[in-house]
Amino acid sequence: MKTTAAPLSPRKTPIQRRSVATVEALHTATIQVLVTEGLSRCTTTRVASRAGMSVGSLYQYYPNRDALLSGVLELHLTKITDALEAACISVRGKPVREMACAMVQAFLSLKLANPDESKALYGVAAERDGARLMGVMYERMVNDIAQTLITAPDNTFPDPLFTAHMALGVITGPTRAFLEGFIPHDYTDQFQAHLSRLLGDYLKG
């Protein structure tokens, strides 16, 4: 017997101020449960309890746990992608080292603003809809970087799109290693400067 996958889209889009506040409360509660109890124990019951509402109220906005987690992850990724896009636009026509500093600063300003949240959401990204969301946002970021790189006066890239893929990897790889504790947090004060230099040196060739 063929089964139908449960929907991952929200039941309704919050329009009224009260609805927006409710969704924000659910997102905050979800992050808190993820951080304190882990992904496996992040249930709709626990999230609703943490948010101070009934499970029935939660289901008015999200039909199931997967949809809730997907919504939280999508918001997180959208904020980062939007910030990187704004940074790219702000440095178009600038030298590549200036571009590198702006891209790294924009990415880290959100990723490191709440390290526990960022780390917890890596686990959510491995869930059912995470790969799709990551793919959509990844493509946006790569395109934004590529469109910016071609405006650099010291642009020497034979393939700006491939360079953009590599540049994004230079940013995201060390950042994840830092958030997951592989890079000791003793280096917090130096991390952004070193990452900016690493990316700048790569782009400068």
Where does each model-flagged region fall?
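N-terminal intrinsically disordered/low-complexity leader segments
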Residues: M1-A21
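Hydrophobic/aromatic-rich alpha-helical bundle segments in the mid-to-C-terminal region
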Residues: K2, S118-G123, A131, I150-L198
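Short, structured helix-loop boundary elements
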Residues: V23, T44, D66, S70, ...
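Short linear capping/connector segments at secondary-structure termini
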Residues: A86-I89, A120-R128
